[in-house]
């Protein structure tokens, strides 16, 4: 199985610094099991796999794997993947967009390509909103007014 890939050091300006990342370009027909084996072989914190987007309005579908499992989102893999894809466009003589939008398990991830004097130097992302779950106020209030022995010794907030 021949696949093109690139390794990159993210969050650094020197080789072998920062966070290493493997980016598998044109992941094609790789199965989840195959991606997992490849990620385990690289043994980096994360490895990304790039597929064509499902929606042509987006830049790519990106799947992120640790050596043990797939994850819905992670910061440095997105930054590194955007950097690699932008550099690939430059190498092919194609224009580099100001933004990429990756389709991921966590949702659409927008990234901005950073250029200095026409050279791709990095990328930055806006993380998707965190998923939170909070209890309704009535339930929280009930807990605070509980007759539990520990709570009964707490000073009243009123």
Language-model segment annotations:
Residues 37, 58, 65-143:
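Acidic, low-complexity central loop/insert segments
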Residues 139-158:
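Single conserved hydrophobic/aromatic residue that forms the stacking wall/gate
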Residues 16-24:
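Generic N-terminal amphipathic, Lys/Arg-enriched alpha-helix
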Residues 44-61:
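Conserved phosphate-donor
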Residues 23-24, 38-43:
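N-terminal beta-alpha supersecondary unit
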Residues 12, 51-54, 113-117:
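Short, low-complexity Ser/Thr-rich regulatory SLiMs
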Residues 1-17:
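N-terminal, positively charged, Ser/Thr/Ala/Gly-biased leader segments
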């Amino acid at each position: 199985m021949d696949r093109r890939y690139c390794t990159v050091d993210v969050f650094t300006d020197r080789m072998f610094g920062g966070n290493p990342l493997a980016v598998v370009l044109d992941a094609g027909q790789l199965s989840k099991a195959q991606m997992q084996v490849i990620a385990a072989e690289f043994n980096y914190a994360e490895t990304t796999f790039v597929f064509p987007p499902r929606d042509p309005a987006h830049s790519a579908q990106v799947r992120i794997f640790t050596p043990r499992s797939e994850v819905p989102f992670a910061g440095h893999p997105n930054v590194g993947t955007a950097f690699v894809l932008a550099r690939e466009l430059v190498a092919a003589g194609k224009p580099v967009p100001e933004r990429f939008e990756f389709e991921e398990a966590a949702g659409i991830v927008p990234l901005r390509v950073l250029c200095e004097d026409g050279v791709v130097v990095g990328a930055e992302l806006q993380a998707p909103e965190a998923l939170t779950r909070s209890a309704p106020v009535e339930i929280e209030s009930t807990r605070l007014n509980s007759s539990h022995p520990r709570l009964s010794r707490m000073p009243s907030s009123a």
